[in-house]
Amino acid sequence: MKLIAGPASKELGERIARLLNVKTAPIFFKTFPDGESYVRFDVESLKDEDVVIVQTTSPPQDQRLIQLLLMADNASDMKAKSITAVVPYFAYARQDKRFLTGEAFSVKTVVKLLENCGVSRIITVNAHNPEVLNTFKISIEDLSAVALLAEYFKNEGLVENPLSLSLGKKALSMATEANSILKGGFDYISTRRDAITGDVALEEKKLAVRNRDVIIFDDIISSGGTMAKAVEFSKERGARKVYAACVHPLLMGDSQKKIMEHGAEGIIGTDSVFSPVSKVSIAPLISKALAKKEQKSG
């Protein structure tokens, strides 16, 4: 196995390599003054190698996606036997269908680009809609980091018998998965999204949060608006401590400040995206999936 740590996931790639007891392949990146990306593998050949490229595609997602495509196509040109793209945060996954007539089916386009660049397998983490990934021909494995987040809360002693909440009923599986470790019960905060503006409103729903510690789980925190509303919603109903937990802490703009000002005790995320709140590493999760595949092919 040859592991290539892309510029967006250098630290994560190196952590995965250490767990797998492999070295990362030397690689050189630069950005030209006009913004174009340059990639060079400092190896003579990748012939007959199983290549793993680790590159998250968080903002600036277009640049990071292009870098990923350049790396994959380059590995293909250098005769790699197989190419696995580890894309912890999968850009454009939220555009998982045509909500309005004439819209691009963005996630399908991204998957096609990766396929055309020689990628035979994709590993991602808590994709926004994992069901849509199963409709593509290419092998896509969606891992869940929720248990790692729950274990962090349990081991750090940040909360006592917490209620695990998801943002929206569709994401209830996140709360149930967390509750399998935290054991304090689970529920969801009811949400409604405007198809045109994308704005999310919270709907009135009874929640047993009074005098309880609460952890609100979501796959992504981007602008932080919905999470801030959810934290405030819980605090107004008597929750004692409220934590925000997410797999992909994009934390655009003043989102972190916004969530804290609405009453959060703290924000905990993973290193799928490097951020000030990335306290939990997904390296063990990914290395386990890669090792399992290696054993099967071996």
Model-predicted regions and their roles:
Residues 1-298:
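PRPP-associated nucleotide enzymes
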